[in-house]
Amino acid sequence: KDDYNSLPSKVIAAFWVIQQTLTFKYIFKSDDSVLLQNDKFFDTIIGVITRMVPKVHYGGKIVNVEIPYMSKYYLLHPELPKDMIIQSTKYCTGSLYFLSSEAVTNLLSKRESVCKEYLEDYAIGLNLDKILKTNMLNIQTNKYFTDFEDFTS
């Protein structure tokens, strides 16, 4: 199904295909509604990631949900349930995040749990083992990416 609510299933399916067909250290995922503003971003960020000790497995613009709350995302996406609770977790926003191959393997082992969620970026952070989130890299994505809507206005 090709709708907003199916995004967690589509992303985890894409991760599975990538894992089955490619050898990779990291995978980058971005929204299709953002435009890269700096051509050197990926060269720079890959350099940073590969030099980090201990190894970083997950990064992007970090959201730290300290207290569970009732989501209001249905106001932007009416197809979402109105009673969706966002649990306490750390996750990276969907505009851009990256995962190590180990993190992808970990998430694929939790495929069913990821697919039960409605918000893809949140589902990734919620289901990724905490040990793989101990050394997250915070990226100020708004410095490197622009929403397509902002670009066209």
Name each model feature, range by range:
Residues 8, 26, 30, 34-126, ...:
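Conserved catalytic core of nucleotide-sugar-dependent glycosyltransferases
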Residues 20, 131-132:
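Alpha-helix C-terminal capping segments
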Residues 1-25, 39:
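Active-site-proximal specificity loops/subdomain of glycosyltransferases
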